[in-house]
Amino acid sequence: MIPIAYNVRSVVQRPLSTALTALGVGLVVAVFIGMLALANGFGAALAKTGSRQNVIVLRKGADSELSSGLGRDVASIIAADPHVATGADGRPLVSPEVYVLVPLAKAFDTTQIANVVARGISDQAWQVRSNIAITEGQKPASGRAEVCVGARLTTRFPHTGIGQTLHFAGRDWTVTCHFTAAGSAFESEIWGENEQFMPVFRGEVFQSITFRLKDPAAFDEAQRSLQADKRMTVDAHREADFYAQQSQLLGRILSFLAIMITVIMAVGAVFGAINTMYAAIASRAPEIGVLLTVGFKPWTVLVSFLAESAFIAVIGGVLGCLFALPLNGIVTSTTNWSSFSEIAFSFRVTPFLLVLGLVFAVVMGVIGGFFPALRAARLQVVQALR
């Protein structure tokens, strides 16, 4: 085999063309990782939203909370179910919830309006969802027009500070606290008391009922029991699975766009690698002739130049990873197509995506270097030495 040092020396001797080719590959890799990090972050935000200990109950046939409706009688039936866990005070850990969209102007441009989820909860919701933590202020008091704002909203919408007033549904609502939810979609919601939300939004109807399972392993049994109850027509979902499913449509679209955009850009990067390698082979034809003369097989020449092209691509891949790393943790937002509400989430650049970016770079390098390397391997010794 031809020593790899030969290819490394060749790359170093052509700094400008090597740098331009590597930069082209790096930009493609950065876009590839960035788009996948966007899809990854969106999926992770919704996946964190649910707990495998909880069950969310919707009207039968409803595929989202927005299209569901459940009466007070259903809430009472579920609260009495033996599969429901109880709190330290002996009360069932059940939260009948109102789920509506409210239009709010954005902080950076008040002419832009976004739909934000307003969730009316019971007092038990804070125990049902163990990932919720109040970071500032006090929980809304029962019987008052008070709300708690998710951490992701406080920097994106005005009037969300403690003591400030939000206006929606024809009423003023005082912000009494901020909360986090382990980076989940709940952080993009406004929470208030369900009994305060019901009269101004949808009357005597809840959109969903969430409860904590007494035994998380007994979900199937609880699901069968609830769905077989003739007094109500409901579907029961494990909360974690329900919210993960909500991310599938947009997640797939973002992943598809990532692949399409990077494939288009990759074509340009591959042609750049082809031009670079053809130029390298043309200038080193005598060297190739010498290699063939001293006994190196044509296939070793092919492998050598493929390795050289891949090496340049790896440099580009590393650059692309470095370009993409600062994206990690940057907060952005999009519309959740399942609920038509705005959801804020962070770009999520993982080690897996970085490795995937490097592999993609190597693939581009090998494709771009194959035909020039094949030409080098097929050179006739006499022709090469001229």
Annotated model-derived regions:
Residues 4, 18-22, 322-323, 351-359:
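Hydrophobic alpha-helical transmembrane segments
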Residues 15-42, 251-287, 310-319, 364-367:
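Hydrophobic alpha-helical transmembrane segments of multi-pass inner-membrane transport and secretion
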Residues 112-156:
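Short beta-strand boundary microenvironments
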Residues 328-355:
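Short juxtamembrane loops and helix-capping segments at transmembrane helix boundaries
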